[in-house]
Amino acid sequence: DLAIYQLPEPFRSIVKDEVKVINGCHPYGEALFERCVYGVFDPVGYDAEGDYGNEWANSIWISDRGISSGRLKDILLHEAAHAYSYLKLQHCMLDTGVSFRDTAHKRFGNEEYLADAFVYYFGGKWTNYYQLENLSIEDSNWIRDMITYCDWYIENKEFLEKTLGR
């Protein structure tokens, strides 16, 4: 629980309110990689056969291996970044009709690189995909502006939907 409370906003709220955190080996992750990986964000509840719809949808799995690695903070931050991308960024739209998630994927290369960019942005040091010493000032500013815009966008969208009864 302490690791969750140490997450930066907006990740802390998402993990506390919208995502289950499970200590264990994710069944589909283990089937795919033939080992228990450090962490997995599972938005739809995949089982070992790749079928989805199980009760662990919207979950972050952290394995014992991940906990004992000494990298728990960065692993949890990376997986929380996936949750933020899935639950928030894909619903945060630009005036072009493109989601900020798609825009961020184009900027950083893919979902894994985006999650690692968030690790760097929030001061983490260990990543698995995106190997940098530091995130550039330009990328840091871009992420900051994206978070600010999406917080504003989602808050106002929810207000309008509530006001209009949708």
What is the predicted function of each stretch?
Residues 1, 66-75, 109-113:
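Soluble non-cytosolic domains of exported or imported proteins
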